[in-house]
A protein has these predicted regions:
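Short, Lys/Arg-rich, polar N-terminal cytosolic tail immediately upstream
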Residues: 1-18
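Membrane-interface loop-to-helix entry segments
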Residues: 76-86, 137-154, 207-213
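Individual transmembrane alpha-helix segments
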Residues: 66-102
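Terminal transmembrane helical module of multi-pass membrane proteins
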Residues: 157-236
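Membrane-proximal helix-loop-helix units in multi-pass membrane proteins
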Residues: 118-161
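Extracytosolic (periplasmic/ER-lumenal) interhelical loops and adjacent juxtamembrane/interface segments
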Residues: 48-73
Length: 236
């Protein structure tokens, strides 16, 4: 009698499950804040919210308030602040779960990722209203913004350089490095505009998004790549 070979019912290896979870979280983190921004901006109709002119954090201000010559009164301020907070936590966990990082390389990535996560939490807890400048909480908001900008874009550059270790293609790795550099340059430009005094220029919102959105979109794509190829992250 010939023996029958039954299909394997063994569960996926823990490493595969962890890799898929890491990828899913790297999708969910950026998607959360992008979706919160889109919905909050759509709800702001009087006057219409401008992605080019208005600060991102305006969407998290209940208002009415004014800062840097911009009027702020966001109907869904709570949604945007939740998006900031959840982005930082979810994306950090996704990065921490990447199995391809070992030893010192892991900590080199975790440190700026921690700054990114702390930045998201601070942005969510301390909205950047005009009143925040007077009561001192605006300092926490500013620290959160720049910690998030700098930390996230350093993470992008590092993960791009370590692409082989975390299972990303050469193209995706290069994209991460490029968007990280764009983000850091945009952060410097944004800072220079803010400290120059007076009202901000009409494209300040676009400059700020240069520090955030290339990272968010590319990290989301990297997460999707990891979900499709979870085994590539498992070393040894």
């Amino acid at each position: 009698m010939s023996s029958l070979t039954l299909p394997s019912t063994a569960p996926a290896r823990p490493g595969l499950r962890q890799s898929r979870l890491a990828g899913a979280l790297l999708i969910a983190g950026p998607a959360t804040i992008l979706l919160a921004e889109f919905i909050s901006a759509a709800a702001w109709t009087d006057p219409p919210y401008s992605y080019t002119r208005n600060f991102i954090s305006n969407l998290g201000v209940q208002g009415p308030s004014t800062l840097f010559g911009q009027y702020m009164e966001s109907p869904l301020y709570w949604l945007m602040n939740s998006g900031f907070f959840l982005f930082g936590i979810i994306t950090f966990i996704g990065i921490a779960l990447l199995r391809g990082l070992r030893g010192w390389r892991r900590w080199v990535v975790i440190l700026p990722a921690s700054a990114m996560a702390a930045g998201g939490v601070l942005l969510g807890l301390f909205p950047g209203s005009g009143e925040s400048v007077d009561d001192g909480t605006g300092d926490f908001h500013s620290m959160g913004a720049f910690a998030g900008f700098i930390g996230a874009n350093i993470v992008a550059v590092l993960l791009g350089r370590m692409r082989d270790r975390i299972g990303l293609s050469t193209g995706m790795g290069r994209a991460l490095v490029i968007v990280g550099i764009i983000g850091l340059v945009s952060t410097v430009t944004y800072f220079v505009v803010l400290v120059s005094g007076g009202e901000t220029i009409g494209v300040i919102g676009l400059i700020e998004r240069g520090a955030t959105h290339p990272f968010l979109i590319t990290m989301l794509c990297a997460g999707a790549s990891i979900v499709r190829r979870p085994g590539a992250l498992i070393g040894g």
